[in-house]
Curated annotation (Swiss-Prot):
Keywords: Calcium, Metal-binding, Repeat. Ca(2+) 1 binds at residues 23, 25, 27, 29, 34. The keyword Isomerase does not apply. The keyword Calcium applies. Calcium-binding protein involved in larval development and metamorphosis. Likely to function as calcium buffers mediating the transport of calcium from the sea water to the blastocoel where calcium is required for skeleton formation. Residues 10-45, 46-78, 81-116, 118-151 form the EF-hand domain. Ca(2+) 3 binds at residues 94, 96, 98, 100, 105. GO terms for molecular function: calcium ion binding. It comes from Strongylocentrotus purpuratus. Ca(2+) 2 binds at residues 59, 61, 63, 70. Found in cell lineages giving rise to the aboral ectoderm, a squamous epithelium covering the surface of the late stage embryo and larva. This is Calcium-binding protein SPEC 2C. Ca(2+) 4 binds at residues 131, 135, 137, 142.
Length: 151
């Protein structure tokens, strides 16, 4: 499924685990009753109207039980919406408009928003973790993956 390529393996595992915890009968689908029971198990009582509203937000094909692919599609929609915000943040940090964040740009940004300021070693560790192509800078896609993986 193409939407699965949008997520990291770790994200898919988390989503699948959450899905399975709600899918009480293990049939690969979440019914309104299972969703209501899941909320009740954490002491949240929802009206049938609210459950129906939540199901409709995810159930794109109108089949009513929601399968895992529909959950992934909804999550991808949510993340795409956040993507525009991530791009704006990246553009604000990319002060030289090079299309990548240099260690200096990242250091300046992180020093301004952390107290006490992050050390060079801490910033270098962030760059190393996020820098997928090992060029010493963080490109836009790497930045987005870094932000998404922190959730």
């Amino acid at each position: 499924m193409a939407v699965q390529l949008f997520f990291t393996e770790e994200q898919r595992k988390v989503f699948k685990s959450s899905f399975k915890s709600i899918d009480a009968d293990g049939d690969g689908k979440i019914t309104p009753e299972e969703l209501k029971a899941a909320f009740k198990s954490i002491e949240i009582e929802l009206t049938q109207e609210k459950i129906d509203e939540m199901m409709s937000m995810v159930d794109k094909d109108g089949s009513r039980p929601v399968d895992f692919s529909e959950i992934l599609m909804k999550k991808a929609e949510q993340m795409r919406g956040k993507g525009a915000q991530y791009f704006k943040a990246f553009d604000a940090l990319d002060t030289d408009k090079s299309g990548s964040l240099s260690p200096e740009e990242l250091r300046t940004a992180l020093s301004a928003c952390t107290d006490p300021p992050m050390t060079k070693e801490e910033i270098d560790a962030i760059i190393k973790k996020a820098d997928g192509n090992n060029d010493g800078e963080i490109r836009r896609a790497e930045f987005v993956r870094m932000i998404q993986s922190s959730y």
